[in-house]
Curated annotation (Swiss-Prot):
This is Large ribosomal subunit protein bL35. GO terms for cellular component: cytosolic large ribosomal subunit. Belongs to the bacterial ribosomal protein bL35 family. GO terms for molecular function: structural constituent of ribosome. Residues 1-11 have a biased composition (Basic residues). InterPro entries: Ribosomal_bL35, Ribosomal_bL35-like, Ribosomal_bL35_CS, Ribosomal_bL35_sf. Coiled coil: none annotated. Keywords: Ribonucleoprotein, Ribosomal protein. GO terms for biological process: translation. Transmembrane segments: none annotated.
Length: 67
């Protein structure tokens, strides 16, 4: 059976936690157009790394077979 292919776009955006049971991701909306967003919003809410939601985890794992 041939090797499974990894979706490279997903590989750049997601990584496993230390235990490998969960998947980490960056929060959206902190790339550009930042002038009108408050410093508190950018620092506290958008800077945190968060986990992929349980309902989306299956799809992410299909895109990353060797995660």
């Amino acid at each position: 059976m041939p090797k499974l292919k990894t979706r490279k776009a997903a590989a750049k955006r997601f990584e496993a936690t230390g235990s490998g049971k969960k998947i980490k991701r960056r929060k959206a909306f902190k790339n550009h157009l930042l002038d009108h967003k408050s410093a508190e919003r950018k620092r506290r809410r958008l800077s945190q790394i968060t986990l992929v939601h349980e309902r989306d985890e299956k799809e992410v794992r299909l895109m990353l077979p060797y995660l």
